[in-house]
Design a protein with these regions (language model features):
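Short alpha-helical transmembrane segments in multi-pass integral membrane proteins
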Residues: 1-19, 77-142, 186-242, 298-365, ...
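Transmembrane helical elements of multi-pass membrane transporters/channels
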Residues: 17-36, 138, 172, 201-205, ...
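Transmembrane alpha-helix boundary and packing residues in multipass membrane permease domains
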Residues: 22, 26, 38, 75, ...
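Helix-terminus/linker motif at the lipid-water interface of multi-pass membrane proteins
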Residues: 27, 31-49, 119-126, 182-189, ...
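Short runs within selected transmembrane alpha-helices of multi-pass transporters and secretion channels
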Residues: 70, 139-157, 165-173, 194-209, ...
Length: 448
C-alpha cells in the first residue's frame, strides 16, 4: 500500500519525498505541452497554432476551476486520513464522487453553450476564431473526463501517495503525443484532432487512477451506506472545493485582462511574453510542487491536531523555497537566452531581447512567488480555503491594475513587472492570514 502518513517523521524529508514525484509530473506536463505546440505549429501552420494559443486563458479559467474543485474536495479526505477516521473518510469519498459528477454535467452544458460568445468577448481575431472554436468546444465537451482524472488523482494524493497519479499522467502524455500525430497527420482532423487526442488520453489516465484506487486501497472500499447523500459532508466538501476552484478562476481572470493589454502593444510583445511565460512556467514547476505538497501536509497534520508540526513544515518548505529561488535566478541569468531559443528562432533578435528582459524581471521575484504557493496551499489544507480566495483576488487586482493603468503608461516594462506585483500583493494578504488561521486553529483544537 502506497499510503503515506505525513503526521510522523522529519517534515523536510516528507515534504521533499512528496514534492519530487509532483515536480516530475509538472515538468512532464510542460514538456508534453511543448511537443503538442511543435506538432500543431509544424503540421498545421501558424494560424492553427494561434487558434489554439488564443484559447489558453479561457481554457485555464474553466479547466483551472475543475482542478481547484477536485483538489479542494480532497482536503477533508486528507484530514480524516490524518485523524485516522476511516468511516468518515469513506463517506467523504462517496459524496465527493457524487458531487464531482454533478459539477461535471452542469459545467459541460453551460460552457459548451457559451463557448462562441466567450471567444467573441475576448476579441479573438476573425481569421482564427473558427479554429479556436473547433478546438475549445471539444476540450469543454471533455470536462467530465477532466473531473474523473483530477478527482481520482486528488484522492490518491490526499492519502500521501503523490507518485501513482504522476505515473498515469506520464502514460497519458505519451499516448497524447501518439494520438496527436495520428489525428493530425493520418486522419487530417486539424485542430479538432489535437483536442480529441487530449480528451481521450486524459480519459485513459482517469480510468487507470480509478482502477488503481479500487484495487490497491482497502480504506477506499465503499459500502452501500458510504454512497448515501449526506448533506453535512457534502456542504463541507463544497466549502473546500468551490473556493479553491474560484481561486484558480479569479487568478485566470487577471491573466485574461493582462493578456488583452499585451495584445494591444503588438504582436512582437505577444511573442516575447509568450516565450518568456513558457520558460517562467517551466522554471516555477518546483514552486508549484511545494504548494501542492503543503496542502496534503497541512490537511493530514491539521486532522491529527498537530499544529506544531504544521509550523515546522512551513519553516522547512520556506527554506526550500528560498534555496530554489537563488538557483532559478542563477540559471536564468546564466543560461536564460539559450533556454528561450527552445521557443524562439535565433533570427528574432528584438523579440529574444524582450523575452530575456521579461524572464529576468520575473525570476528575481521567485521567493515571493514561492511564499504565495506555500502559504496559500497550507491555509487551504488546514481547512480555511475561503481565505485563499482573497489572495487570488489580490493577484487579480494587481494584474488588472497593471493591465488597465501601468501598461498604457509604461508599455512593455509594466508587463514584465505585472506578475511580481501580483505575487507581492498576494503575500501582503497571505502572511498575516497564516497567523490568523494559526490562532483560529488553536482555538478550534482547544474547544474540540
Amino acid at each position: 500500500i502506497m499510503e503515506k502518513d505525513m503526521t510522523k517523521g522529519s517534515p523536510m524529508r516528507l515534504i521533499l519525498g512528496f514534492a519530487v514525484p509532483l515536480l516530475f509530473g509538472l515538468l512532464f506536463q510542460q514538456l508534453y505541452s511543448m511537443v503538442d505546440t511543435i506538432i500543431v505549429g509544424h503540421y498545421l501552420g501558424v494560424d492553427a497554432l494561434a487558434a489554439v494559443g488564443a484559447t489558453g486563458s479561457v481554457n485555464f479559467l474553466i479547466i483551472g476551476f475543475c482542478m481547484g474543485v477536485c483538489n479542494g474536495f480532497a482536503i477533508p479526505i486528507a484530514q480524516e486520513f490524518g485523524a485516522g477516521h476511516e468511516n468518515d473518510l469513506r463517506i467523504f469519498v462517496g459524496n465527493c464522487v457524487r458531487l464531482s459528477a454533478a459539477f461535471a454535467v452542469v459545467m459541460t452544458i453551460v460552457v459548451v453553450l457559451l463557448c462562441r460568445p466567450i471567444l467573441q468577448l475576448m476579441r479573438t481575431p476573425e481569421n482564427i476564431i473558427d479554429g479556436s472554436y473547433a478546438y475549445i468546444i471539444i476540450i469543454f465537451a471533455g470536462i467530465p473526463v477532466t473531473y474523473l482524472y483530477n478527482m481520482t488523482a486528488a484522492i490518491i494524493r490526499s492519502l500521501g501517495d503523490s507518485r501513482t497519479p504522476v505515473i498515469f499522467l506520464v502514460l497519458s502524455a505519451v499516448l497524447n503525443i501518439f494520438l496527436d500525430l495520428l489525428c493530425i497527420i493520418v486522419l487530417h482532423m486539424g485542430v479538432s484532432g489535437a483536442a480529441a487526442a487530449t480528451v481521450v488520453s486524459q480519459a485513459v489516465a482517469g480510468i487507470c487512477c480509478l482502477i488503481y484506487m479500487k484495487k490497491k486501497y482497502a480504506i477506499l472500499k465503499l459500502a452501500k451506506n458510504d454512497w448515501r447523500w449526506n448533506r453535512g459532508y457534502a456542504l463541507k466538501l463544497c466549502n473546500m472545493g468551490i473556493p479553491m476552484g474560484l481561486q484558480y478562476s479569479i487568478t485566470a481572470i487577471g491573466s485574461v485582462v493582462l493578456q488583452s493589454a499585451v495584445n494591444g502593444i503588438g504582436s512582437d510583445a505577444v511573442a516575447a511574453v509568450t516565450a518568456g511565460s513558457k520558460l517562467s512556467m517551466l522554471m516555477a514547476c518546483p514552486i508549484d510542487a511545494m504548494g501542492s505538497t503543503m496542502a496534503t501536509y497541512g490537511g493530514q497534520n491539521m486532522g491529527a491536531g498537530n499544529l506544531e508540526r504544521v509550523g515546522k513544515g512551513l519553516k522547512s518548505c520556506t527554506i526550500l523555497g528560498l534555496l530554489y529561488s537563488f538557483i532559478a535566478i542563477a540559471v536564468v541569468f546564466v543560461a536564460g537566452r539559450q533556454l528561450l531559443l527552445l521557443f524562439l528562432e535565433a533570427g528574432e533578435g528584438a523579440i529574444l531581447e524582450d523575452a530575456c528582459y521579461y524572464i529576468r524581471r520575473n525570476v528575481i521575484f521567485y521567493f515571493p512567488l514561492a511564499m504565495v504557493n506555500i502559504v496559500r496551499f497550507l491555509i487551504q489544507g488546514m481547512g480555511f480555503s475561503r481565505l485563499a480566495v482573497f489572495a487570488g483576488a489580490f493577484e487579480m487586482l494587481a494584474r488588472g491594475l497593471a493591465g488597465f493603468v501601468l501598461v498604457p503608461l509604461f508599455g512593455f516594462t509594466a508587463v514584465c513587472f505585472a506578475n511580481p506585483l501580483a505575487w507581492i500583493f498576494a503575500d501582503l494578504f497571505l502572511i498575516p492570514a497564516y497567523f490568523f488561521v494559526r490562532k483560529q486553529a488553536e482555538r478550534m483544537l482547544r474547544t474540540g
